[in-house]
Amino acid sequence: MYRIGNGIDFHKLEINLNRPLILGGIECESEFALVGHSDADIILHAISDAILGALALGDIGQYFPDTDPSLKNIDSKIILVKCLELMKEKNFDLVNIDCTVIGERPKIAPLKDRITKSLSNLLNLPLDCISVKATTTEKMGALGRQEGIGTFCSILLEKRS
C-alpha cells in the first residue's frame, strides 16, 4: 500500500542578523531570517506535515503547538524526527520527496546541493529520491514583495510488508 502526503508552510521573512536562516536543516548565509515560534525551517515543516498528512495524523501544530512556550525556538529537526517516528510506528517507509521553495530570496540554486544532502541524512534517503527546487511569484503578492517565503512538499510512503 502507498500513501501520498502534501505539506505546505510559509513564514515571514525579515532582515535579522541575530537569527539564522535555516532551510532544510542547514544554516544559510543571509541577512534574512524567517520569523516563527520554532526555528521556522519551512522545508522541514512542509516535509513533516506531508508525513502526518499521508498517515492521516493531523498536522505539526497538533504535536508542537505555537502556544507552548517550552517549544519556543525548537529545532525543526526535532519536529521531523517525531514525524518519522510516527511513520515507523505505522510501518511505513519514505520512498521519495519533492519540495518546491517559493519566494524571491534567498536564491535556492546555490544552496540546493547542501539542502539535498542534509535532507538525505535526516531522512535516510538516497540523493536521487530527493528533489529540491525553487520558483518565484514573478514579484506578485506578499512573496513577490519579499515579505516571506514558502515551501510545498509532496511525499510518497510505502507500507512495509
Swiss-Prot record:
Catalytic activity: 4-CDP-2-C-methyl-D-erythritol 2-phosphate = 2-C-methyl-D-erythritol 2,4-cyclic diphosphate + CMP
Transmembrane segments: none
Residues holding 4-CDP-2-C-methyl-D-erythritol 2-phosphate: 9-11, 37-38, 59-61, 64-68, 135-138, 145
Site residues, Transition state stabilizer: H37, T136
A single BP term in Gene Ontology: isopentenyl diphosphate biosynthetic process, methylerythritol 4-phosphate pathway
Cofactor(s) needed: a divalent metal cation
Pathway the protein takes part in: Isoprenoid biosynthesis; isopentenyl diphosphate biosynthesis via DXP pathway; isopentenyl diphosphate from 1-deoxy-D-xylulose 5-phosphate: step 4/6
EC assignment: 4.6.1.12
Assigned keywords, A-Z: Isoprene biosynthesis, Lyase, Metal-binding
Pfam family, one: YgbB
Record-listed a divalent metal cation binding positions: D9, H11, H45
Matches recorded under Gene3D superfamilies: 2-C-methyl-D-erythritol 2,4-cyclodiphosphate synthase
Note describing how the cofactor binds: Binds 1 divalent metal cation per subunit.
GO molecular function: 2-C-methyl-D-erythritol 2,4-cyclodiphosphate synthase activity; metal ion binding
Function text: Involved in the biosynthesis of isopentenyl diphosphate (IPP) and dimethylallyl diphosphate (DMAPP), two major building blocks of isoprenoid compounds. Catalyzes the conversion of 4-diphosphocytidyl-2-C-methyl-D-erythritol 2-phosphate (CDP-ME2P) to 2-C-methyl-D-erythritol 2,4-cyclodiphosphate (ME-CPP) with a corresponding release of cytidine 5-monophosphate (CMP).
NCBIfam families assigned: ispF
Quaternary structure annotation from Swiss-Prot or TrEMBL: Homotrimer.
Family matches, as HAMAP family: IspF (MF_00107)
Family, as annotated: Belongs to the IspF family.
Protein name as annotated: 2-C-methyl-D-erythritol 2,4-cyclodiphosphate synthase
